[in-house]
Structure formats: C-alpha cells, structure tokens
UniProtKB/Swiss-Prot annotation:
Organism whose genome encodes this protein: Halobacterium salinarum (strain ATCC 700922 / JCM 11081 / NRC-1)
Stretches the record annotates as Disordered: 161-195
Catalytic-site annotation from UniProt: E133 (proton donor/acceptor)
GO biological process, one term: dUMP biosynthetic process
Protein name, as recorded: dCTP deaminase, dUMP-forming
Domain of life of the source: Archaea
Record field: compositional bias (Basic and acidic residues): 165-176, 185-195
The keyword DNA damage belongs to this UniProt entry's keyword annotation: no
Signal peptide as annotated in the record: none
Pathway: Pyrimidine metabolism; dUMP biosynthesis; dUMP from dCTP: step 1/1
Residues carrying the site annotation Important for bifunctional activity: G120, F121
Function according to Swiss-Prot or TrEMBL: Bifunctional enzyme that catalyzes both the deamination of dCTP to dUTP and the hydrolysis of dUTP to dUMP without releasing the toxic dUTP intermediate.
Amino acid sequence: MILSDQDILARLADGDLAIEPLEDVDLQVQPASVDVRLGRRFLEFERANVPCIHPNREDEVDEYVTETVVEDGDEFILHPGDFVLGTTKERVEVPRDLVAQVEGRSSLGRLAVVVHATAGFIDPGFNGRVTLELSNLGKVPVALTPEMRISQLVFTELTSPADRPYGDERGSKYQDQDGPQASRIRGDREFGGTQ
C-alpha cells in the first residue's frame, strides 16, 4: 500500500519515518510522496583514456571520480550526455515496515533530466542522504540549483516488517552516507567482499 499524504504526515509525527530537514511541509509533502531537494555535493566522472574501469578495483573507481561542492548562489551545469552523482539535502530514515522509491519530478523530466539510472529503491532500515544518479538526456545544458526540489520519495508499506533490514548489522555499504557515494560494488561477495 502506497502511503498518502495523511499517512506520511502521521508517520513523520510518530517519528519512525524521518526526513530532515523537512523545512516546508506544505510544499514538500505531496498527495502520495515527499519532494526532496538537491544537495550541494556532486561526484563527476572524469573522461579518461582507459579501455574500461574494473568496478571491483577501488583505485580505478576512485581515480576517475572528482567531487564538486556548489557554493551559495551558484549552480551546477548538467551537460547533455553527462552522468553525475548528486545527493539529497535531506537525510532519510526508513523504518523496518516501509520501502521508499526515488522518482523524478515531471517538471525536470520534461527538461530531459533523470534522477536515477537503476538505484531507485530504498530498503527498510536505510538511514542517510539519498545518492541521485543524475543524467541529462537532452541536447542543451541544464542548470541545477542546490535546494531545488529534485525528486520525490514514494513510501510503500510492507506486508510485515523486514526481519533483516538494511543497516550496520548487515554491513550495508551505503548506510549513513552523508553525500554522494561512488560505487562500492567491490564489497559484493562475487568480488571478494562480504555482501
């Protein structure tokens, strides 16, 4: 069951669902979602003369990623064909009986901006800022301003609370992230990790 605005507000008031800072409830809480705003930090992938990046080699992934922090009053220009990682301003804490889905806002979609490539699902137990996989599918650059409403979170109630939620007990790779995170796929079992 997808939570309505009434359900979202009740869960926020109870404190088991947290979205902070939620500075303008009337603006951000929609009929069946919550608009979240763009943070100031971005990870950009450098164009390099390499045949490929091996996801399981930390040095290769880290070598081709640079962080940009947008200052007050400035904007981040997302160029056609670019893919960058951004983050939400808000931290989100999802209780054991809910999942969240990251969806794009229609107004940005009409400018050819997408907010996630594949990672649009937030597990029960997640706590942190949401990493956004931003792309410009259009033909002209788009200026993104920190604190603009960039995406929406849709919450769905599980049939029962998760017995093994996302989090520290599972060694979850992205728990408590405070900004955009590059791939940590090297932590997966098939690459010698524990997950």
